[in-house]
Amino acid sequence: MIIVTGCNGFIGSNLVAKLNELGVKDIIGVDDLSKKDNLINIAHCELQELLDIKDFENGYLQENQTHEHITHIFHQGACSDTLEWDAEYMMKNNYSFSQRLLELAEKNSIAFIYASSA
């Protein structure tokens, strides 16, 4: 199982498309699904599941979840809005979420790949 955060963004959607091209379909896409205009980026891709970031945090990032089926985390999810003024949101979204993903990967020996256009 591969997790791709930021799957609706430029890098994430192209990554999912390339993985699909290589025959990989067991992908969980994670993004802020309240931004419906971004869903067009991922519409042509095949995902096993598409999750809102909040649902992902409340599910996969909980201590009581098993993670042995996850082999890779491609972390492309971040707020790239240079006009965003909400410091609390930026810290939660760009720092704390990344930290929790990295801790999950480290604890479970999951390959962690990070890229951002922000």
Regions found by a protein language model. Give the residues of each.
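Residues at the starts of beta-strands that form the adenosine-phosphate
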Residues: 1, 25-27, 111
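N-terminal Rossmann NAD(P)H-binding glycine-rich loop of SDR-like oxidoreductase domains
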Residues: 2-24
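Active-site loop/turn elements of alpha/beta-hydrolase fold enzymes
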Residues: 32, 78, 117
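Conserved active-site region of classical short-chain dehydrogenase/reductase
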Residues: 95-99
